[in-house]
Each structure stands twice: as C-alpha cells, then as structure tokens.
Amino acid sequence: MKKKIVTILCLSSLLLVACGKTTNATTIQTTNDEVITDNETATTEDSVTDSDDVDLVLDTEDGILQSNETEISAVEVEQVEPLSYQTYLEFMMSQREPNTNAIFSSESLNSAFAIYAELLDTSNKEMFKAYLRNKDYLSYKSIDGLSIINRLWVNELKDFTLTRGPLVDKDIIYMMDMSDSAQATEFKNQFVSESTNGFITETPTVFDKNTFVDAMNIIYFKSKWVGGEKTLCDGLKEFENEDGSTSQVEMFCDFGDYIAKTKTATAYKMDYENGMSFVAILPNEGYTLTDVNIDDFINNNVEYEDADVYAEFPKFEAKSTYMASFDSFNLPLNPPFKEGLTICDTEPPVISQIAKIKFDNEGTEAAAVTEIVKSDSMAMVEPKPHYDFLANRPFIYYIQDYENDDIAFMGVVSNLAD
C-alpha cells in the first residue's frame, strides 16, 4: 500500500509555530504582599460614593483624571465579533521573525482580559465579555498537570478600595509597595518563577511608582504522554525548514487511529496523561503555514477519520515574547474605567506575554505569563486507510484544555537549525 505523507500544523491553548530559530519570550512582572478580602476593604471618603455601582476606587497623588464613561449600546455589544483562535494565530505569526519558532497562549491572554474587564465601565465590560464569547475565564479550573493563576497587582502607593465582585470573591487582588522598583520587580519575578516551577523566571514588565494596576495570568502545563514515553526513530531525520534549508534532527514516532484533513492541511492528535491533547496541523503539499485556518480544526468543522496512522515528530523548544496594545486585537485602545474608579487614563494599557515550551518523546512542558499593565505614563469493517504523518517540515500545533473547553497553547515549528 502506498503510504501518504502528511504535514501537520498544530494549535493548542498554547499556540506554537516551528520554523527554525527560537524567538525570545516576553513576560510580565508581578509582586504580592497581601490579599485584600471583603472584610479588609478600605474606604475613602473623598473617592467612594454611595452608588451601588462603585466597586473600585484608585486615587493618585498627582495627575488625577476621572474617566468619563463612554456609552456603548446593547446593539453594538450584540454586533461584537468574538475573537477567534485564527486571530491569535495570525497575531503570533505576524509578531515572529521569519523562519523562527514561536509559541503563544490565547487562554492566558483571555484570562488577563477578563481580569482587566472587571475594572471597566458597564458597557465596555459587556463588550469585552462578548469578545471573549461570554466565557467565565475567572472560573477556569486547574487540573492535574495544568495550573492556572490569576492576579490583579495594585500599587500600594495608590489608594485602592474594592467592595465586591469576582476579583474580591476569588482573592485575586494583591497589594504591594512599588516605590522600590528593583525590589518590586524582583518579587514579581520570583512569584512567576515559583508558579511555573522555574520554567519562566522573569517577565519584561517592570513595576515602579507610576504603575497603577497589573492584570496577570499565569498558565503552567506539564504532562507525559498517554502510554508512556514515545519511541525514538532510528537515526537522525531530515526536517525541511521554512526557508528551504534542511536540518538533521532527532525525532520520535507514534502510531494512531485517527486523522483529520482539509484541502490545505492535515491534523494529527496525541493525548497526554492529564486528559489534554497535542494537535499538530501540517500544511498539505503545495500549501504553507499561512494557508492554514486553525479554527476549522478547533471548532470541530473537520471530523477525524478512522485510519491507520504512522507519525513522526521532532523534539523542539521555543520561547516567545510579545508586546501589544488593545487595538492589536481590535479592542478599544484605552477603554474607560467604571464610575467611581479614579485613575490616570492618559496612557493606554500595555499587553505583554512571555511563553515557553519544551516538547519531546517524554511529554510536554509549557508556560505563559500574560500581563495587562496600566501606568501613568461501524456490519463489515472496511480496511483502514493508511497514512504517514511525518512532521518533517514546518507545522502548527496547539494544546487543548478539555476541562475548560479552551486552547491552552498554540505555536509553530519552522526551523530546527542549531
């Protein structure tokens, strides 16, 4: 029987692209001293009103501007087109250098968006929820092998009052003194390192006296393959890099029963012990990474076919750093805060993410830290068709979080040159 060679692009909660070089990853720094509970909520006569709508108050010593609420109609909210995984994939691809590997976590970014949305006026909060498909990211659960941590870091130099809401109920608020920038930043980095088992040790964000709030999400994943360690292939295998060059690399093999195909790409899935899955999407011959629509596979627009599949995958590592603004995702550049939340709004918030992955025959370890910082400045059985799924050229991948019905990571592998 003639074997079919399938190239795969794969995406997950952590999006990864393999192309060759590895890009540096960006992370967000945070620190925490104490948790503000409902019983410990402070009050400020000058800034807290009697309105039931006032949840947060943030005062600054100088340059105070009271945000004016911008009305967004219910019709406008209903017309919001939710952010798609393809949007995140295209963002990741646009931010990386050509012929480099990359990884990105849409789950982490959306969780940070959900935290920040709790600070916004009602109409903008509802708009953000619509962009996030009205999913309750603040209720996402950690499972064996997947840790999800949310934090809202608040500068202790700013008066802050929180009376109720999910940020209080879930103990997400942490206050810290940011007057000593080096100390505050180091404390934040230590927290990140401890939360990712040392996999990510620092982020690009720096805390200082001008920092108001930092909405942070940390996601850490580590799991072995179902069935144990995969078998290494005999000898080195050739990987065709994105730029047309080739590399001799170590690969491992796998045998599966299902494969999914579209006109432009083919997907193959491998399961982890903790119940999550790694899905690789390989562009078909004649197509490239940019021809792949990841939503076709994630949204189950393509059904998996019962087949006899032989697959090969390279070991790889990737690390990526991203800096962006809200308009990078077609969101309002600087949405106003809720009434009663006094904060300097001259500078729009900045988004940063650092993501990292290690993928081999034993399993996968991956992590991402996202920050949004606001600062001043079957009958008869037919014979199964046979396919070879050889990930020996650039492919996309993602790691699926079934517990929370989301994609934890997505990425690309395009260059395995030393």
Where are these regions (language model features)?
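Composition- and surface-driven signal marking solvent-exposed, interaction-prone regions
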Residues: 230-231, 291-296, 371, 405, ...
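Non-catalytic, conformational "gating/processing" segments within enzyme and secreted inhibitor domains
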Residues: 99-100, 137-284, 304-381
